[in-house]
C-alpha cells in the first residue's frame, strides 16, 4: 500500500508541475505488473489527490496577461497572480478542494445508492446536456467565443476521428491549448509577473459550506458529462449565485475533488469508468467492492491534505522566484520542451499542438474563456453518443 501511495504522490506531482503532462498519461501508459490490487487503488487515488490542487500552478504562472483589464475576463487565478496575491488564490483552491472532499465523503453512502438510478435516468439526455452547456458558454463569450468553439471543435473532430496519425491526441491538444499557446502569448507580450506577497483569503464562515455543498453536487453531476471540466460550467454556476472570484475558485476547485470521488463510486455502482483513474483501476483489477471504495476515498482525502499543502508551499516559492524576466525564461523553456516532445511523438502530434496553440492564443487575446477550447473533446464525444459521425 505504501508503495502505491508514494508512486501515486510522485506521479501526481509530476503531472501537476509539468505543463502539458496530464495524469491520464500515466493511467493510459502505465501498466505495472508488480503492484497488487491494494497498491493499484492507492496509486490511482493518491495521484488524483495530488494532481487536483497542483494542476492550478500552471494556470497561475503560465500565460499570465500583461494587464489587469484582460485578466478580468480570463482565468480568475491569474487575476490574483497579476495582483501579487497568488498565495491567497492557492489557499482558496485548497479550501475548496478539502471542504468539498469532506462533503462528498460524508454523502458517500447516499451517492452509492443514487448514482445508478441517476445514471440510467440521465443517460439518454447526457449528450444534449453537454451540447447545452457548450452552447450556453459560447453564447456568454459572443462571436469570438463562437469562433473559438468552432475552431476547437473542428480540430478535435479531425484529430479524434480523422486520418491523422497523432500518437497521443489528448496530450497534443491539451498541451497546445493550455501550455504552448499561453506560453507563447506570454513571451510575445513580454509579460512580467509581479512579486507575490503572503496573504489569506477573507471569506465568511457561511461561504465555505455553501460552496462546498454546491461543488459536491455539481462534481457528481459533472462526472456524467464527458469532455467537460469545472470551468466549462461557469456559465451555469454564475446563474446559481457563484458571482465572485472567491466563490468561483472555491466551487471550481471543489468540483474537481467531487468528480474524483464520484468516479470511484461510479466504477463500483455502474461498472462504468468515467475518468482516467477509474479506467486504469478497471483495466488493472476489474470491478471494485464497496469496502474498496471506502478505502480509496479515504486515501484520496488523506493525500489531498498533502496536495493542498504542496500547492500553497509551491505558490509561495514560485511567487518569490518567478518575477520579471525569470518567468519568461522558464516559460520559454517549457514551450521549447513541449514542442520538442511533440516533435518526438511525430508530425501529427506537432501539427495538432501548434494548431491548438494558435486557437489558445486567439482565445487569450480576444478575451474568450480558454476553457471553451475543451469543445475539441466535448463536442466529438457528444456527437458520438448521438450516433453522428
What is each of the regions a protein language model found here?
Residues 1-4, 40-43, 145, 149, ...:
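Residue-level signature of transmembrane alpha-helical entry/exit and packing/kink sites
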Residues 1-37, 160-229, 235-241, 337:
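Helix-loop-helix hairpins and the membrane-proximal interhelical loops
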Residues 92-192, 288-389:
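Membrane-embedded alpha-helical modules
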Residues 3-4, 32-56:
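Extracellular loop-to-transmembrane helix junctions
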Residues 27-32, 78, 131-137, 234-238, ...:
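Generic transmembrane alpha-helix motif of multi-pass integral membrane proteins
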Residues 7-23, 52-63, 136-139, 215-226, ...:
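Transmembrane alpha-helix interface/packing and boundary motifs in multi-pass membrane proteins
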Residues 44-130, 232-335:
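Helix-loop-helix junctions within the multi-pass membrane cores of secondary transporters/permeases
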Residues 18-20, 34-40, 139-143, 165, ...:
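Transmembrane helix interruption/hinge and helix-loop junction motifs
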Amino acid at each position: 500500500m505504501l508503495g502505491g501511495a508514494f508512486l501515486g504522490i510522485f506521479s501526481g506531482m509530476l503531472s501537476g508541475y509539468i505543463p502539458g503532462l496530464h495524469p491520464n498519461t500515466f493511467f493510459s501508459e502505465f501498466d505495472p505488473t508488480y503492484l497488487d490490487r491494494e497498491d493499484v487503488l492507492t496509486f490511482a487515488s493518491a495521484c488524483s489527490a495530488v494532481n487536483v490542487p497542483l494542476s492550478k500552478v500552471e494556470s497561475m504562472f503560465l500565460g499570465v496577461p500583461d494587464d489587469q483589464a484582460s485578466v478580468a475576463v480570463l482565468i480568475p487565478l491569474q487575476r490574483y497572480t497579476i495582483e501579487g496575491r497568488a498565495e491567497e488564490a492557492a489557499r482558496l483552491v485548497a479550501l475548496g478542494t478539502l471542504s468539498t472532499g469532506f462533503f462528498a465523503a460524508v454523502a458517500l453512502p447516499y451517492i452509492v445508492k443514487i448514482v445508478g438510478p441517476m445514471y440510467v435516468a440521465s443517460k439518454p439526455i447526457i449528450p444534449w446536456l453537454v451540447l447545452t452547456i457548450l452552447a450556453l458558454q459560447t453564447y456568454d463569450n459572443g462571436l469570438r467565443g463562437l469562433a473559438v468553439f468552432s475552431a476547437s471543435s473542428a480540430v478535435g473532430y479531425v484529430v479524434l476521428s480523422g486520418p491523422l496519425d497523432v500518437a497521443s491526441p489528448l496530450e497534443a491538444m491539451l498541451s497546445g491549448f493550455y501550455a504552448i499557446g499561453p506560453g507563447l502569448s506570454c513571451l510575445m507580450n513580454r509579460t512580467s509577473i509581479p512579486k507575490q506577497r503572503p496573504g489569506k483569503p477573507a471569506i465568511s464562515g457561511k461561504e465555505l459550506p455553501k460552496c462546498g455543498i454546491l461543488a459536491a453536487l455539481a462534481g457528481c453531476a459533472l462526472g456524467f458529462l464527458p469532455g467537460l471540466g469545472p470551468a466549462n460550467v461557469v456559465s451555469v454556476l454564475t446563474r446559481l449565485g457563484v458571482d465572485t472570484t472567491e466563490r468561483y475558485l472555491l466551487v471550481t476547485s471543489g468540483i474537481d475533488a467531487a468528480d474524483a470521488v464520484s468516479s470511484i463510486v461510479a466504477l463500483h455502482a455502474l461498472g462504468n469508468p468515467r475518468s482516467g483513474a477509474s479506467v486504469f483501476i478497471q483495466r488493472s483489477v476489474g470491478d471494485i467492492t464497496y469496502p474498496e471504495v471506502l478505502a480509496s476515498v479515504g486515501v484520496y482525502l488523506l493525500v489531498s491534505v498533502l496536495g493542498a499543502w504542496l500547492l500553497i508551499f509551491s505558490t509561495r516559492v514560485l511567487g518569490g522566484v518567478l518575477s520579471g524576466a525569470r518567468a519568461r525564461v522558464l516559460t520559454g523553456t517549457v514551450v521549447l520542451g513541449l514542442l520538442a516532445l511533440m516533435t518526438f511523438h511525430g508530425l501529427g502530434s506537432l501539427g495538432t499542438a501548434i494548431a491548438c496553440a494558435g486557437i489558445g492564443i486567439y482565445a487569450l487575446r480576444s478575451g474568450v474563456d480558454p476553457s471553451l477550447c475543451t469543445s475539441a473533446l466535448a463536442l466529438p464525444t457528444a456527437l458520438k453518443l448521438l450516433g453522428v459521425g
